[in-house]
Structure formats: C-alpha cells, structure tokens
C-alpha cells in the first residue's frame, strides 16, 4: 500500500533577478561574474592575506610584497584567460588567487634579502611556481575534476626540483610567543574552524590532527632528531613533538590545504579516513628526515600521495550519502567486540607504530653520535690555558646570552679538542671517532680523507695554535639546517705527514686564517660542521 503524494503548493511568483554585469569589448558584451560575499574562498583568502600582513609587519617573514604579488597575479591572469576561453565570460579568479597566495605563503627563495619588503629578488620564481601549480589543475584531472590541490603539488615539485639551495618551505617555528604570534594563531584557528565547519570538513581536519599528533608522538618517543635553522641544538623529544604539532604552518596545512573540497572524498566516512591516512603517510615520510627542509617537504608530500590514491580509497569506503555513509554506524561495524577484530586492530596499530619507528632509523643516533664513550678513551691533547680570549659578536649574544656570559670558552675548548680527535681518527683509522666530533660537510670531508688513508695513502695531520678567535653567528644558506657558531680564528698550523707504516715523513708550519663552523649536539657537546675561508677584511 502506498501513500499518495501531497498536492503541489501553488507556485510562488517569480522573483526578477538582476541582469548580470557585462563588459563590452569591440562591440561585444561579455558577462562578468564577481565573487559573492558568501563564497568560502573569500573567507579563506581573508585569513591567508591577514597572515601575510602579520608576516610582513611583525613576524619577519623572508618573503617580499612583489614576490607575493607575482604569485597571485600570475595565477589570476592565467585563470581569467582560461575561463574566458572556455565560457566567453570574465569570472573572478577566486580559486586561482588562493593558489598563488598559498604558494607565496609557504615558499621562500634562498637569497631573498631580509627586512626588505619591496625587494623584487627572484619574483619570477614565484610567478613560475604559482603558474605551474595552477595549470596542474587543468592538466592532471580524473573524472572531470582536478586530482591534486594545486598549491600543494606545485610546492612539492618546486622543492624537489629546485632543491634546498634555491628554495625552501616556511619554517615550522615562526617566532617566540608574542602578540604577533598570538594574533596569527587566533586568525588561523578561528578562521579555519569556521570555514571547515561550514564546508562540513571539520571531521576531516580533526581526524588528521589527532592522528598526526599520536603518530608524531611515537616518532618523537623513538629518539627522532631534527636540525632546524631556528635552534642551536637538535630538536628532539617533547620539543620536536610540540613545535610541529602546534606549528601554525601545520594548522594552515590542515585547515586550508588538505580540506580542499575538490580533492577530498565526498562522503563522511571517506573524509575522515582520508584525514587519518594523510597523517599516517606524512609521518612515515617525515620519519627518516634529519633536517627541517626534508621534514616539511615530507609533510606536504603526504597529501600528494593520498590525492593520487584517492580513487582507490573511494572504492573502499561507503558510497557517499548512502545509508552506510554514517560515521557512527561505520565505527560500530568496526567495533572491537570480538576477539578476532580486537587482535586485528592491535596488529594494525603495532605495525603502524613499528613502521614509524623503523622509518625513523636514519634520523636517530646517526646524526649526533653519543660521543662520551668514544672520546673518553682518547687523549684530548688540548691545554685550555693556551687558548686566547674569545671576542663575541652581538648576534651571538642576542641569540644565546649564555654563550656571551662564559659559555663560549667551553665551545672553543671543544673545537680544539675536536680538531685533535680528527687527527686521532686518521691515525687510528677509526671512523667512529669522526661520528663523535663531526657533522655535515665536515664529516663528509673527513670521511673521504679517512677512506684515502685506509686505502694506503699518507696520513696528513693538522695541529692548530690559536692566536685570536672571534665568534659570530652563521645563518645557513638555503637548506633549513641549524644555526652554527662561526669561530673566526688566526694562528699557526703545524702539519705532519706519516706513511702507511706510521713513520713521520714530513712537517710544515705556516699561518692560517679560517672560520671553523660548530653546532651544538645533544647534551653539552659541539660538533665541527665546516671549515671556511676567513671573511674578507
């Protein structure tokens, strides 16, 4: 038995709609479509633009206004041209301008002069990256829609192609918690919550953040270590977890990048699953990274991977808007009431945790070796009383006052010891010693010298006698590596040469004028990271 449908209500009188705006060119009138105040894209734009303003005014972002405009205007011009070609109408390029603004917010070009907001340095790099990001929306498509978030795929490709010496992502850590940072957190969080709630994507964002926090907690607890430009010491443990999980850059990623309505599943269950999987994939990609550049690119790459496999995910989750597409019902179906399901869930969780720990092996214990056991068995061969008093640059004192109040003496003693330990590594043909005192370029250089010695080559030692030392702050060029102390030293270098049998075959002596770069390791150790020519003058 069926019920007859109710009688149709009388039709409401037609409401006259205003005629669309037009622009007449060459005698032809073309429709003009401007944005609506209700358009969520305008709300996202207001948040991103506000962050740009805060970055210029109070947060010291290393990006200039011309660079930002180059990215936004390039995308806008391309989008207007493409849509006009398709529809013979002028459409406000809201999405395109978001793509350009997002690229400019996250990308930094190495060499951009700080504190010069109107610098035109490398503006064309922003234009090219933003333009290619936008074009990806029209080139890489599946079932009538773009596959990747345009700014996300463009940034990942740019960082991988250009490399850390030319381009780098915005730092995880922006500034100390001051009024500017509080304003940035307020704008990003409030705007993000309102927009994602309106788009019904809050569940996706929450699923990502909770899963990401848990997965990153496993990685941090395993002893993961990351070097970063804004920290002298390696970022490990709770500091590593806290900085990244609460990073405003991660909040921008979860509120305004992974929640792109066009690139996420349309169903409720699918969206939550998508957020969980982006968090897991991003953490697995971040795990082996030892510096901030690789960590940030890995985070962004997690979304690229999941967008690429989204068609497969769509097949595994309930049909959107079907009776099964209910998150509570789906969770009940996956309930752990039976021992078999509970055991399977436990195995999955253990496998994921083990995978994260295993993937993080390259960033654990190898970057900064535990040196106490190794160095405790070797002669230091350094008399601190023979070292000169150290003059300290104001940049060092401003960054770490403890170094200006006596801590620099210990740094210089450690440098002198490390240089002698390098000699011991060559004499003893022991690479473990190098891991305890060197890192980065210096480690690679000394390992190459050690390989030559182990192959039967002569042993060349260098003993340094310091006459003067000046400490300054070395800002890494490009790669988001840690700050280093530059010890500009002058004095006399005595060189010794030994043959494969251990007999000394020669000795030289002469002045040196070099800058020794050192970086703080875990604990109170400092590592040699480079030897540079002294600055001119």
Which residues fall in each region the model found?
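Structural signature of hydrophobic alpha-helical transmembrane segments
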Residues: 59-74, 112-128, 169-184, 236-250
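Core segments of small alpha/beta cavity-forming domains
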Residues: 387-465
């Amino acid at each position: 038995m069926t019920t007859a449908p109710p009688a149709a209500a009388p039709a409401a009188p037609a409401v006259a709609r205003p005629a669309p705006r037009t622009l007449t060119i060459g005698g032809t009138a073309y429709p003009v479509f401007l944005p609506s105040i209700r358009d969520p894209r305008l709300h996202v734009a207001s948040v991103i633009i506000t962050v740009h303003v805060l970055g210029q005014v109070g947060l010291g972002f290393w990006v200039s206004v011309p660079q930002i405009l180059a990215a936004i205007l390039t995308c806008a011009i391309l989008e207007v041209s493409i849509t006009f070609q398709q529809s013979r109408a002028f459409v406000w390029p809201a999405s395109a301008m978001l793509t350009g603004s997002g690229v400019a917010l996250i990308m930094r070009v190495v060499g951009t002069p700080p504190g010069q907001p109107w610098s035109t340095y490398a503006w064309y790099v922003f234009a090219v990256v933003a333009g290619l990001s936008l074009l990806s929306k029209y080139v890489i498509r599946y079932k009538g829609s773009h596959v990747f978030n345009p700014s996300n795929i463009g940034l990942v490709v740019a960082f991988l192609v250009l490399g850390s010496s030319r381009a780098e992502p915005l730092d995880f850590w922006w500034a100390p918690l001051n009024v500017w940072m509080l304003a940035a957190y307020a704008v990003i969080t409030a705007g993000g919550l309102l927009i994602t709630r309106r788009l019904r994507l809050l569940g996706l964002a929450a699923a990502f953040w909770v899963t990401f926090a848990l997965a990153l907690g496993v990685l941090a607890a395993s002893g993961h270590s990351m070097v970063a430009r804004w920290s002298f010491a390696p970022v490990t443990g709770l500091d590593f977890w806290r900085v990244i999980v609460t990073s405003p850059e991660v909040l921008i990623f979860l509120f305004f990048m992974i929640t792109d309505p066009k690139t996420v599943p349309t169903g409720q269950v699918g969206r939550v699953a998508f957020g969980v999987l982006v968090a897991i994939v991003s953490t697995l990609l971040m795990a082996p990274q030892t510096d901030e550049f690789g960590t940030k690119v890995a985070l962004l790459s997690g979304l690229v991977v999941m967008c690429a496999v989204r068609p497969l995910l769509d097949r595994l989750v309930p049909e959107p808007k079907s009776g099964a597409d209910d998150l509570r019902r789906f969770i009940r179906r996956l309930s752990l009431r039976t021992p078999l399901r509970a055991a399977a869930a436990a195995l999955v969780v253990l496998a994921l945790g083990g995978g994260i720990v295993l993937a993080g092996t390259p960033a654990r214990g190898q970057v900064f070796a535990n040196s106490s056991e190794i160095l405790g068995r070797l002669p230091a061969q350094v008399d601190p009383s023979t070292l000169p008093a150290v003059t300290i640059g104001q940049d060092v004192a401003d960054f770490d006052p403890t170094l200006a109040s006596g801590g620099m003496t210990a740094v210089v003693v450690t440098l002198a010891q490390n240089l002698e330990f390098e000699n011991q590594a060559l004499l003893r043909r022991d690479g473990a010693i190098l891991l305890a005192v060197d890192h980065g370029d210096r480690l690679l250089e000394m390992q190459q010298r050690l390989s030559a010695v182990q192959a039967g080559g002569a042993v060349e030692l260098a003993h340094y006698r310091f006459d003067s030392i000046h400490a300054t702050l070395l800002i890494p060029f490009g790669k988001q590596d840690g700050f280093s102390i530059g010890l500009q030293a002058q004095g006399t270098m005595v060189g010794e040469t030994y043959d494969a049998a251990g007999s000394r075959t020669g000795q030289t002596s002469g002045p040196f004028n070099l800058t020794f770069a050192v970086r703080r390791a875990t604990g109170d150790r400092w590592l040699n990271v480079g030897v540079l020519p002294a600055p001119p003058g």
